């Protein structure tokens, strides 16, 4: 506490706090992003999302495709790699893709059954009061550098099929900008 009132270091600390607040205001403005404080189409790591969602375990423990918020379990965070490694096993080569700017097809992990609690939450999220957040990246790594995920926003299941894995069609709450859509799905022409 003495450092905060110290005549030499106090002004430096005050300047650093002021700078941080001004930088935040310039980047995000005064808008309320709402829980879990995610900015649409911004990039995040799984660790950052875990911290913003108040995930209680160590942030390396939720590696994989889903992270369920522990505070009431009302939010699911899906982390998706669109392009898998060429040597990936067929059993985990999920058929995840953007159908169009408003729809995404996602396959659950092989361990998720349609009649399990998690399966029902993912395939019937609105009925079960669950919120689905989609995070997508083209590749896991580029030049040995782990890539960040782009937050696509909230999504709601509109249909599902198969017992295990479950293929779910999600309707995006926000239509993706055309440039971002074509970055993720360059082979699909949009007129």
Regions found by a protein language model. Give the residues of each.
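Acidic, glycine-rich low-complexity segments with interspersed aromatic residues
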Residues: 35-148
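C-terminal helical accessory/scaffold domains
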Residues: 1-37
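Compact mixed alphabeta submodule
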Residues: 141-191
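Detector for methionine-enriched segments
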Residues: 1, 22, 51-52, 88, ...
